[in-house]
Amino acid sequence: FQDLGVNTLWISPIQKQPDSSWVEWVPPNRTFSGYHGYWPIEPRKIDPRFGKSEEFNSIVKSAHQTETKVILDFVSNHVHQDHPYLRDHKNWFGTVNLPDGRLNIRQWDGDTRLTTWFDEFIPSFDFPSAPVAINQVVEDAMWWMGEYDLDGFRQDAVKHVPHSFWKSLTRSAKIRFPEKNIYQIGETFGSDELIGSYVNPAELDAQFNFSIYFNSRGVFSSDQSKFYDLGNVIAENRSTFGPIHLMDNITRSHDKLRFSGHADGQIELSDCILARWYF
């Protein structure tokens, strides 16, 4: 890693996942599993398919010996329906039905941004109505950081979680681990203004820079965009985040198809729809 210039490892979620497969709510109603780690069924247990606790400790220790940081992907927005929090504290979660009778599933933006479920079996926390749930999930995050000597988190689905949660988590991390230079980066699909609203000393250090990602992908993989357009996006980006920031410029995301798939011209719209991941 050092020869490659890598100084930080981002580990995907390792919390215990369900054993069985589940049918997706939207057509074509695919059957798939929680292999990706984003369907937690236990708050503080490593999925045995990913390894053992002592093995993860060894990985982090080995990384630190080479001055390499380790951040863990943490899921705060939701759990799988087999999670004990849903079983024991149903009042911590919102309902899947909207007042007009529609299902509040994958309604990513607007008034439902903070309440939508990712699927019928992936309930989202209702943090504004259940402050005790904020305290519990924050404590879980602190447990992972302390138990495995982590250097920070990649925070999942940031825009679906209220600011009050992120402020509570960041405040707790700074108080509990004052000796650590904790780094938190978030994932938010949305406008620069929405992405930037979570980046401040009280919440996150950075987010993935999706506006530049999408535009640069169009420039370098096809003739859909021009360098002039990318230049405008970069200028707008700097206006929002400033010339000096920790925003993460990426070449790919595990939520999207690989750059090479776009560049070789083999991907059709239908393939993009079929290949989507929902976390």
What are these model-derived regions, one by one?
Residues 1-5, 60, 233-240, 274-279:
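Short amphipathic alpha-helices and their capping/turn segments at secondary-structure boundaries
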Residues 126-130, 154-157, 259-272:
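Active-site rim elements
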Residues 236-239, 250-261, 271-278:
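Substrate-binding and catalytic surfaces of secreted/luminal carbohydrate-active proteins
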Residues 60, 64, 68, 139-142, ...:
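Active-site-proximal helices and loops of the catalytic beta/alpha 8
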Residues 75-76, 158, 189, 255:
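Catalytic metal-binding/acid-base residues of hydrolase active sites
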Residues 118, 149-150, 255-258:
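Flexible glycine/proline-enriched surface loops and loop-helix/loop-strand junctions
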Residues 41-45, 255-265:
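Short, basic, glycine/proline-bearing loop/turn elements
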Residues 3-148, 168-182, 186, 193-195, ...:
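Substrate-binding/active-site clefts of carbohydrate-active enzymes
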